[in-house]
Amino acid sequence: MSDRVIISLAPVAADCPRVEPNEVADEILACVEAGAAIVHLHVRDPQGKLTPDTRYFEQTIAPVMAQSDLIIQASTGGVSQMTIAERCAPLACRGVEMASLNVGSVNLGDNVYFNPTPDVEYCSRHIVERGIIPEFEVFEIGMINNILALQDKINFTQPMLFNIVLGHRGSTPPTIDALIAMRSMIPRDALWGITHFGRRDFGLIAAAVGMGACEVRIGFEDSYYINASETVTRNVLLVEKLATLIRSQDKEVATPEYARKLLNIRHR
C-alpha cells in the first residue's frame, strides 16, 4: 500500500472553447506549488480541438519544464477522427516523459472511443521505442487483460501503471464495487491510480487513496466540481483539496522527484 500519492493534473476540459499556452502553463505551475507531480495534456489548437499539430502543446510545456521538475505526460487519446499516427504526434516532442495509452474501445457518452488492438500495439511500440513511460488507461475490466496480453510482444517498463477510469456515461460506473472489481484484476506487482470523470465529490477518490492508489488524477478535463454544489475556475483549488485529503489519511503528497523514482523516469 502506497504511503505517498502522486497528484496528476489534467487541466484542460475537452469542451474548453479557448486554449492559450501561456495561461495553461501558468495554471500548471500554480498546481505544481500545490502538489502536482505530473501534468496530463492533450494536443489542442487555440479553439480547444484535438489536433496533430504540436506547436501549441510545445509552447505550453516549455515554460513548465524551464521552471519545474514536473513530469510531462502526453495524451495519445481523446475521441476524434485522427489516425493513430496523428494521435501519437506528441511522442516526438522534446520533454515528453510519459504517455497515456488507451488499451481498448469503449462507449463514452454518445460516442465510441475507438481503440482496436492494432492501434494499441502501434502506439505501445512507439512509446516504448522512445523510452517514454506508459500509463495504461483502463475504462473496463477487459482492457486490463488486453494490456497484459500485449506484454508477450512488448517489453514495457516495470512497474506498470494502470489508471482506473470511472464515471463516463456508457462505461464503468463510479462506485466502490466497480473500483474494487477493477483493482482486483490488476497484478499485485503493478501500480495503480484513479480518475473519476464527472466527479461531484471526493468520496471515490478518498476510497481509492485508502485502498492504496499511488496516483490520483484531478483537473478540469474530468470535473470542475470542488463539492456537490460548487464549481471552481482554477485547477489549483482542486489540487489543494486533493492534497489535503491525502494528508488527512496520514499519507504524503508525492514530489516530482519521488514520482520519477517510482516510475523509473530520469531527471531532465
Feature locations, PLM:
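Glycine-rich, proline-tolerant flexible connector loops at the mouths of alpha/beta enzymes
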Residues: A37-T60, L108, V165-L166, S223-A228
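Catalytic alpha/beta core domains of metabolic enzymes, predominantly
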Residues: M98-F220, L237
